[in-house]
């Protein structure tokens, strides 16, 4: 079935992109990205016992894009991906039964999606090469109605770093490359009013992991209303997501030159009501003829550990948190977080971005520094490091494993990514 779905996607492509001779030509594009990284783990880290420290990894990401517009209002989109990983982290992740691509290149499994459009080309202990279809959709865009069916993406919410309202393949807050979200098989609609407000609806069917059958308990149906009044924009959301009922709202407005954003999400599951909240302020200014923007964001995760006990034994009892982490919806273990960041224009071609992610409950933090340099047109270099801060027993210092004196601790990492866009 897996290979049949993949081949079906390939064979459907010519039909979707083939149009009458009078139509415009296909718009092609894409990128090739190569990343080299090295991660150093402490001696008491569980990763040190199953992998070389420092761990050296290489990743390859090739994406070919095709988009077709014909007449008005039809369009079609296709993205092909070739993904490769080679290195010590893959060996360690397999030894610890952790998905390597969840750690390095984002979610790639199509196990629960309606169509399995991912196929492994080759695989060994320290390497894997696979290809997949990440976008394959047909769209209609009228004056007041928009519809799209197929593999596509949706991004919602006002969170700039933490995104509780964006539960369709959100980015890890500490991800260094946020160019492309992973696509989902969905049906999307949007109704636009004369005043500029809109109502969006998304249906994402998913399969049961065990049986492979499409199930309503694994699927999502979401509606979001967006409107603007004076200088304030607001959102209202209602969803059935897996077996949860979700209600939410968000605001965004200008205040004395800064932009204030916030989202509040309530999840009703197993007779429990759980809240999530994010609020941020961002401000831009010029200093010494350099453009600078700053960001401060608070995040509350009601699914996180309330008592600050992040041991493996304690986490296994928090099934709601672990389920959302395994689905790629949550990336934190605690409840209260503060992120502070800035974007500094060193030169028009060089951007420096320092960010500090802090767990307010245990005081641990993750420091990230990114340097983005445009070498020339279509060529880009992204380099930097991440440094966990905190004592053992904390989220970023290292959570206790089941082995006494051994911790699941993140390592300090150096990385460089070279990108070519075409």
What kind of feature is each model-predicted range?
Residues 26, 72-76, 144-147, 196-199, ...:
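Repeated loop/turn-to-beta-strand initiation elements of outer-membrane beta-barrel proteins
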Residues 380, 385-387, 405-422:
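Outer-membrane beta-barrel "beta-signal"
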Residues 34-40, 82-86, 142-144, 151-155, ...:
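Transmembrane beta-strands of outer-membrane beta-barrel pores
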Residues 67, 74-198, 204, 390:
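Outer membrane beta-barrel
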Residues 62-68, 135-141, 187-191, 223-227, ...:
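Residues on the lipid-exposed face of transmembrane beta-strands in outer-membrane beta-barrel proteins
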Residues 30-32, 78, 149, 189, ...:
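Membrane-embedded beta-strand positions of outer-membrane beta-barrel proteins
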Residues 258-261, 265-357:
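Detector for outer-membrane/organellar transmembrane beta-barrel domains
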Residues 54-60, 129-134, 141, 181-185, ...:
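Residues that define the transmembrane beta-barrel architecture of outer-membrane proteins
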């Amino acid at each position: 079935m897996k290979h049949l779905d993949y081949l079906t996607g390939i064979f459907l492509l010519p039909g979707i992109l083939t149009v009458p001779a009078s139509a415009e030509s296909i718009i092609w594009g894409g990128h090739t990205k190569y990343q080299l990284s090295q991660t150093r783990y402490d001696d008491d880290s569980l990763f040190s016992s199953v992998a070389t420290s420092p761990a050296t990894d290489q990743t390859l990401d090739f994406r070919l894009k095709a988009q077709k517009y014909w007449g008005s209002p039809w369009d079609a989109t296709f993205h092909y991906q070739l993904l490769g990983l080679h290195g010590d982290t893959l060996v360690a992740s397999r030894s610890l039964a952790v998905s390597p691509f969840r750690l390095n290149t984002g979610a790639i499994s199509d196990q629960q999606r309606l169509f399995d459009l991912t196929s492994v080309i080759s695989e060994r202990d320290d390497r894997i090469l696979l290809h997949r279809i990440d976008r394959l959709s047909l769209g209609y865009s009228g004056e007041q109605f928009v519809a799209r069916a197929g593999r596509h993406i949706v991004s919602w919410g006002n969170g700039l770093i933490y995104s509780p309202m964006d539960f369709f393949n959100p980015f890890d807050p500490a991800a260094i490359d946020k160019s492309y979200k992973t696509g989902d098989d969905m049906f999307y609609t949007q109704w636009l009013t004369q005043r500029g407000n809109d109502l969006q609806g998304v249906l994402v069917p998913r399969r049961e992991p065990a049986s492979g059958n499409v199930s309503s308990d694994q699927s999502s149906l979401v509606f979001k209303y967006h409107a603007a009044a004076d200088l304030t924009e607001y959102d209202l959301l209602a969803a059935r997501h897996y077996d949860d009922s979700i209600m939410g709202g968000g605001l965004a407005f200008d205040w004395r030159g800064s932009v204030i954003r916030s989202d509040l999400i309530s999840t009703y599951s197993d007779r429990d009501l759980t809240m999530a909240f994010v609020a941020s302020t961002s401000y831009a200014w010029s200093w010494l003829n350099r453009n600078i923007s700053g960001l401060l964001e608070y995040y509350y995760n009601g699914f996180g550990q309330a008592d600050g006990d992040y041991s493996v034994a304690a986490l296994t009892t928090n099934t709601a948190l672990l389920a959302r982490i395994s689905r790629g919806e949550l990336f934190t273990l605690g409840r209260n977080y503060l992120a502070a960041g800035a974007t500094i224009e060193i030169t028009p071609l060089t951007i420096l971005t320092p960010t500090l992610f802090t767990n307010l409950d245990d005081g641990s933090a993750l420091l990230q520094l990114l340097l983005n340099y445009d070498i020339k047109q279509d060529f880009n270099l992204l380099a930097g490091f991440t440094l966990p801060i905190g004592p053992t027993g904390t989220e970023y210092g290292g959570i206790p494993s089941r082995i006494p004196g051994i911790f699941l601790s993140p390592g300090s990492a150096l990385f460089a990514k070279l990108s070519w866009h075409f």
